[in-house]
Amino acid sequence: MRIHAILFSLLCARALGAQTFLQMSDPQFGMYTKNQGFAHETVNFEFAIATANRLKPAFVVVTGDLINEPGNLSQAAEYQRIAAKLSPAIRLFSVPGNHDVENEPTPQSLASYRERFGPDYYSFRVGDIAGFVLNSNLEKAPQHVAEEAAKMETWLKGELAKAREARVKHLIVFQHIPFFLKEPDEEDQYFNIPRETRLRYLKLLHQYGVHQVFAGHYHRNAGGRDGDLEMITTGPVGMPLEEGRSGMRIAIVSDSGVRHKYYDFGELPESLAEIK
């Protein structure tokens, strides 16, 4: 009986891990010291990656501001050095933030990001999850890269249609800047996407059955709903603002939906089984 119980536990853990992911945001190497170093960020991100290796999720997504100073090679190298410590069994998806591609992206800043980190928007599939990584600064400030912004939006429509045709159960969007912090019709500000673009994207996401958007940028936790779409804004792995604390979000995906909770570094569970 004991052997059966152990096998059952292992099978449950495997199933859980296949539908579990960690969201980390804003490691932002260099923020604590205004680009004079990144020792604090190194400690935090090392701990975050070690935690991921212990918890063994299916994947980790880092929702932007990988570095603090656009184009800073030493900051980028440190992010990649630590990220490379993630177990090969756990997939890693990096998302561009405004500090990675500049507040107003240019063809040059996009090219620099792509050369260093890879595509700035793309899709992926893990089990019953179809993930869509977006470059939110193409939504926020496309004035210098209008063609790229239009290209991403057209691409997203096509990818969402493919996922729906394939009957993927969970379609989830990951980007850096949240569409909104609390209300879908809130006023434009630094921490959200301009209303005209926001509402257009939200309409598209509703059309294809997207129920979750995970973002960062705010360096604190926030969230709201637009009907059955949940906007989840996650606090930082790196430096928090105001009442925020460094940590990460754990998401559990099942037939009944997506459950998630933000954990400060001091309150992380020992295993995923604790939060089933």
Regions found by a protein language model. Name each.
Residues 163-183:
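Short acidic, glycine-rich surface-loop motifs adjacent to enzyme active sites
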Residues 252-276:
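A short C-terminal boundary segment appended to hydrolase-like catalytic domains
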Residues 1-5:
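Positively charged n-region of N-terminal signal peptides that target proteins for export
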Residues 17-77, 275-276:
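N-terminal active-site segment of His-dependent metallophosphoesterases
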Residues 26, 64-65, 97-98, 176, ...:
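Active-site glycine-centered loops adjacent to acidic/histidine catalytic or metal-binding residues
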